[in-house]
């Protein structure tokens, strides 16, 4: 009890210090009109910076270089003041050098490559169209919105004569996140290691904030900040038989039948929920057990998931194939491991006629603390931006994967978020059709990053140090958390 009392006291002091750490007199105005900002963002979507993951489609890197030139033309002050480094031909690193070299830098990470589109499935131009106060286009949420919002916010800060931060800030824009970031953010992270850079914190993409009634009956906005990610395991299962292949004389057991039985075992035996997972993922503390079980989004947060994603066998109706293959995908929760998942699946199948070939894997990420200064500043900024609504800011788990996997040794403090309130259809559109953001939400995203940057530190030509409103409400300390132990 005494330890818990002092821990809570420490958090109160931390919040007070944060509230007094940045400049309340700073009033940075955007230098472009609402229309200019919207059309500039629409133009950014016109560059087909597509990451193809199949060899039949060649990536058009000219589009990536055109996007570089677009940024140079749209953000002249940034390119004059910040140091730009091109990493591995196509990724971009901007260094905004701070005046205090003893402070660890802040990294604002994102990516500008996008997934392919099936144009026939789009009602609007997938490469940028403004209609009904919405900006449509691939990348409008994932993830050019963050690239453009951070650039617009910093261009505005610089234009308002706040030219040098106390703490160095890096903008890190990868070019192949949709392929795993091996040539983009992995190389940027290597650049930091070679230059002995350790970061105070990294802010990267995450899940959009959940709109009111995203979970039926829950009326608050849920601002989930990803403090850890699931891992993954992708593999191919193959069954083989040595039998006559004419359909007129079928074998007792076919390759398809053997594989189908194995897949049925896998699908009908899901992984069990991790005990006390809500202590790591505090978003789950907002709901009771029945609500979690009945909601696919919440239920997936409690366990390692299984998805049967592809199957292949046979070439003609009257020929029985001697081999059949299927691909399976698991998203591995913190508390399970790759080896555990692999062993459990092989035990379930229990058939030597089936082989497993691993095609991709990643262990679950480390967990970042929500009680660091960086997290608390992010939390206060969310309250500033969405202060007119009922907002719950909670540390949570990201079920997808980001480029942060390449930075685990650069900092312990990695926070994933998307400062846009989304509904179910917004989630569906991210890698689907008619991906969009409203003009208002885009402008708000620019303001969010402007506030976050100003809140994170004073500037060397700023006289006061009180930017965050002291009256901002801070979420109550949550005792049911692993972080309080």
UniProtKB/Swiss-Prot annotation:
Keywords attached to this entry: Hydrolase, Metal-binding, Protease, Secreted, Signal, Zinc
One Gene Ontology molecular-function label: metal ion binding
A GO cellular component entry from the record: extracellular region
Record-listed E.C. numbers: 3.4.17.-
Listed cofactors: Zn(2+)
GO BP annotations listed: proteolysis
Residue numbers binding Zn(2+) 1: 142, 178, 431
InterPro entries found in the cross-reference section: ArgE/DapE_CS (IPR001261), Bact_exopeptidase_dim_dom (IPR036264), Pept_M20A (IPR047177), Peptidase_M20 (IPR002933), Peptidase_M20_dimer (IPR011650)
Keyword hit for Signal: yes
Name by which UniProt lists this protein: Probable carboxypeptidase S-like 1
Species: Dictyostelium discoideum (Social amoeba)
Species classification: Eukaryota, Amoebozoa, Evosea, Eumycetozoa, Dictyostelia
């Amino acid at each position: 009890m005494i330890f818990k009392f002092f821990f809570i006291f420490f958090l109160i002091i931390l919040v007070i210090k944060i509230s007094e750490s940045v400049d309340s007199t700073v009033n940075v105005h955007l230098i472009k009109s609402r229309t200019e900002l919207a059309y500039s963002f629409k133009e950014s979507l016109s560059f087909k910076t597509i990451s193809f993951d199949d060899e039949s489609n060649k990536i058009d890197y000219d589009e990536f270089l055109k996007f570089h030139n677009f940024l140079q033309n749209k953000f002249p002050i940034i390119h004059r003041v910040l140091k730009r480094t091109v990493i591995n031909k196509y990724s971009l690193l901007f260094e905004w050098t701070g005046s205090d070299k003893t402070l660890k830098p802040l990294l604002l990470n994102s990516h500008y490559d996008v997934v392919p589109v099936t144009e026939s499935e789009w009602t609007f131009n997938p490469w940028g169209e403004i209609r009904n106060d919405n900006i449509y286009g691939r990348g409008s949420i994932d993830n050019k919105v963050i690239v453009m919002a951070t650039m617009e916010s910093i261009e505005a800060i610089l234009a308002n004569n706040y030219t040098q931060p106390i703490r160095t800030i890096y903008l890190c824009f990868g070019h192949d996140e949709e392929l795993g970031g091996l040539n983009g953010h992995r190389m940027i992270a290597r650049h930091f290691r070679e230059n002995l850079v350790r970061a105070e914190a990294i802010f990267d993409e995450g899940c959009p904030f959940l709109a009111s009634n995203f979970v039926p009956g829950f009326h608050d906005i849920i601002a989930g900040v990803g403090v850890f990610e699931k891992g993954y395991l992708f593999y191919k299962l193959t069954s083989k038989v040595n039998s006559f292949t004419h359909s007129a004389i079928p074998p007792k057991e076919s390759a398809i039948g053997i594989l189908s039985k194995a897949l049925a075992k896998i699908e009908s035996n899901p992984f069990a929920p991790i005990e006390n997972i809500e202590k790591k993922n505090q978003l789950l503390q907002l709901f009771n057990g029945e609500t979690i079980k009945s909601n696919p989004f919440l239920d997936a947060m409690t366990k390692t998931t299984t998805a049967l994603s592809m199957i292949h066998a046979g070439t003609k109706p009257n020929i029985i194939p001697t081999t059949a293959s299927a691909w399976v995908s698991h998203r591995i929760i913190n508390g399970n491991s790759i080896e555990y998942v692999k062993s459990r699946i092989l035990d379930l199948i229990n058939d030597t006629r089936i082989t497993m070939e691993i095609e991709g894997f990643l262990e679950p990420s480390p967990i970042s603390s929500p009680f660091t200064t960086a997290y608390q500043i992010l939390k206060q900024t969310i309250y500033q931006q969405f202060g007119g609504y009922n907002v719950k800011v909670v540390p949570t788990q990201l079920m997808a994967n980001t480029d942060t996997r390449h930075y685990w040794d650069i900092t312990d403090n990695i926070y994933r978020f998307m400062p846009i309130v989304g509904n179910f259809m917004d989630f569906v559109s991210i890698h689907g059709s008619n991906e969009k953001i409203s003009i208002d939400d885009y402008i708000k995203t620019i303001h969010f990053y402007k506030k976050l940057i100003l809140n994170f530190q004073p500037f060397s030509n700023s006289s006061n140090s009180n930017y965050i409103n002291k009256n901002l409400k801070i979420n109550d300390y949550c005792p049911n958390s692993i972080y309080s132990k």
